Swiss-Prot record:
Keywords: Cytoplasm, Iron, Iron-sulfur, Metal-binding. It comes from Yarrowia lipolytica (strain CLIB 122 / E 150) (Yeast). GO terms for molecular function: 2-(3-amino-3-carboxypropyl)histidine synthase activity; 4 iron, 4 sulfur cluster binding; metal ion binding. Coiled coil: none annotated. Pathway: Protein modification; peptidyl-diphthamide biosynthesis. InterPro entries: DHP2, DPH1/DPH2, DPH1/DPH2_1, DPH1/DPH2_3. Component of the 2-(3-amino-3-carboxypropyl)histidine synthase complex composed of DPH1, DPH2, DPH3 and a NADH-dependent reductase, predominantly CBR1. GO terms for biological process: protein histidyl modification to diphthamide. This is 2-(3-amino-3-carboxypropyl)histidine synthase subunit 2. Pfam families: Diphthamide_syn.
Length: 481
């Protein structure tokens, strides 16, 4: 008897064993999440509804943290876990906190420290870092650097170790002028000593990411942690040299940056007709003000804009809006600017800084890349005499004949009274060319028909069709049953 054939197939994906995680001890949780200090803070204030925001890597500890806190805080205090943030994890999730009507947000892990619209306490935790390994990994790069100054900065979660790292670098490189950043709002942070938060001009302490006291091109930046793509790009264009140390891997790393790609996207925004303003943060205090500034600047430059709030942006969400030519993202400068996997989006995504450059009448690219929206120039001055002048698009290699929302000038009094009129193939509303009409004309599928355009073919005449039961009908010489 022959053997039966094997009908099963190999699985498409390999089976992965479940990750078994050892439950951390109470001592570890108390130290890592600064629970004694947090308990003292909560009991000394009148907050009754507390939202605990955890980063993705620490969500597994959230239930254990809540259990320990309930044993020590006032029984009238309600604790809620925010496990999935609406926007960047470094930002305070104001939207989620408002859903539960929280009085206070406790933000664990790395934070961007942007001003927010509600009370917040930052807990940077206490991740371990081997300072000796850090110095050894960075020694070669520091010795090869020509810059006399060194600025030490890090992810905010490593700020408890900042004094130790600072002293180690000073001892290892006495010939260098070494300065470091510090936390600007110590009253909102837990787990930091006075030494870690107090500025001292003699010691060279500086405010976080406010380095106006240094000549950037004469300074080497040392960053401890894993910077976001936007922060790495900003640092690479601002300082004379950069070096990064990842405490998790224990290795010095060099993040990839693509400044020329940003220049290309900026030119695409310059030639765009319709710009989508994508709000990628609702927690920042200047969100409304910046949104109005962007709308005004885009309108003054002769372009059309739409404002969108879609939660966490992804390819599928933004693909629904075909009329948008370029997306301008306003959000946290560290985690709210879309640079990761941007090639997957159907339309280019630019930052507010890039949009500000694109809207100017004359292109001026200094090579710097700014993440602070307050430093973006959105004052657009357009010469009315140059509105109809064509300009060259270096991306497509073509000339664009006019600004998208320019005003058509024509002298027929009867035609000027019309609300809607087709001029030279472009639809105008009150003498203004509309981007919606241009978008419709460029589409292969324009719907079932519209009232404009004399070149349309006449529709077929309506005739009475066949009637009766659908059987025994004939098509040509063939009989179909």
């Amino acid at each position: 008897m022959s053997q039966a054939p094997v009908l099963s197939t190999e699985p498409e994906f390999e089976t992965v064993a479940p990750l078994v995680r050892e439950t951390p001890s109470n001592d570890y949780l108390n130290k890592y999440y600064c629970l004694p200090q947090l308990t003292e803070y909560l009991n000394s204030h009148e907050y009754k509804s507390i939202a605990l925001q955890f980063p993705a890597n620490d969500v597994a500890d959230s239930a254990l943290v809540v259990r320990l806190l309930k044993q020590t805080v006032d029984p009238s205090i309600s604790l809620f876990i925010l496990a999935d943030t609406n926007y960047s994890p470094c930002c305070v999730d104001v939207v989620g906190a408002n859903h539960i009507k929280a009085d206070l947000v406790v933000h664990f892990g790395s934070a961007c420290l942007n001003p927010v619209t509600m009370p917040v306490v930052y807990v940077f935790c206490n991740p371990e870092i081997d300072v000796k390994v850090m110095v050894d990994q960075l020694t070669e790069q520091i010795k090869d650097a020509e810059q006399p100054n060194i600025l030490l900065d890090s992810d905010s979660k490593y700020y408890p170790e900042m004094p130790t790292m600072f002293k180690a670098l000073r001892e290892a490189f006495p010939d260098k002028i070494i300065v470091r950043s510090f936390i600007p709002n110590p009253q909102e942070t837990l787990g930091l000593s006075e030494e870690e938060t107090k500025p001292d001009a003699e010691e060279g302490y500086l405010y976080r990411r406010t380095h106006d006291d240094l000549d950037p091109q004469e300074t080497m930046l040392i960053y401890v942690g894993t910077p976001s793509s936007s922060l790495a790009l900003h640092y690479s264009t601002r300082f004379g040299a950069t070096a990064y140390f990842n405490p998790v891997s224990g290795q010095a790393e060099t993040p990839k940056t693509a400044i020329m790609k940003r220049y290309r996207y900026m030119n695409m925004a310059r030639a765009a007709q319709t710009i989508g303003i994508l709000i990628n943060s609702l927690s920042m205090s200047e969100t409304k003000e910046m949104s109005k500034k962007l709308q005004k600047a885009i309108a003054e430059s002769g372009k059309k804009s739409y404002t969108f709030v879609v939660g966490k942006p992804n390819v599928a969400k933004l693909a629904n809006f075909e009329v948008v030519d370029v997306w301008a993202v306003f959000g946290c400068g560290i985690g709210g600017i879309i640079l990761e996997n941007e090639e997957q989006y159907f339309k280019p995504v630019v930052s507010v800084y890039e949009l500000g450059l694109a809207l100017q009448p004359e292109l001026s690219w200094t090579g710097e890349w700014e993440i602070d929206s307050n430093k973006v120039d959105l004052n657009v001055e357009v010469d009315e005499d140059e509105v109809d002048e064509p300009f060259f698009n270096p991306v497509t290699g073509k000339f664009i004949d006019h600004k998208p929302l320019h005003v058509q000038e024509y002298s027929d009094d009867e035609e000027t009274q019309a609300l809607v009129k087709s001029i030279g193939g472009s639809l105008t509303i009150k003498n203004t060319v509309t981007t919606a009409a241009i978008q419709l004309q460029q589409r292969e599928w324009q719907g079932l028909g519209h009232d404009y355009g004399s070149g349309e073919e006449d529709g077929a005449d309506l005739e009475e069709g066949r009637g009766g039961i659908a059987r025994g009908y004939a098509v040509g010489d063939d009989e179909r049953m």
